[in-house]
Amino acid sequence: MEKITLVILAAGMGSRFGGLKQIEPIDPEGHIIIDFSLFDAWRAGFRDVVFIIKREMEEEFRECIGDRMEQYFHVSYVYQDLDRLPEGIEAPEGRTKPWGTGHALACCKGVVNGPFAVINADDFYGHTAFSEIYDFLAAQTDESKYACLLYTSPSP
């Protein structure tokens, strides 16, 4: 079976939050939300993780998350740099911020070379979500098949 990679979008600016919310503890024991996602991902079968981060947050991110996870996963880092754009595309003069999710995933070219799932570093998904997407990807033999896990929300 081809390796299945979990790609984690962790380069968010944190401007509304006021800091790196990816590494902010959410309980008295000091767990961060990504701890729960990675635990559930490991239980589902993921063993390869790619963190998409900003280059300037690498040291703090590795200390808080990456180094701990290397005992469970093969961990890679991709930088969402403004100069890493698809061929023929240039950033407008004066632009300092990277683009969003599409740009982040384009930066994975050459690092992710098979089936993969994508999550946000600061969202909670639960074990079922990871199991369902992993099982789908593991069973898939048709490269033209894709999946998106969606949740229904109760009406307000």
Predicted feature locations:
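Conserved donor-nucleotide/metal-binding helix-loop-beta segment in metal-dependent transferases, i.e.
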Residues: 130-150
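Conserved small/polar residues in nucleotide/adenosyl-binding loops
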Residues: 151-156
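Short beta-strand-to-loop acidic/aromatic patch adjacent to the donor-nucleotide binding site
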Residues: 115-122
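Short catalytic-loop micro-motif centered on adjacent basic/acidic residues
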Residues: 48-52, 120, 147-150
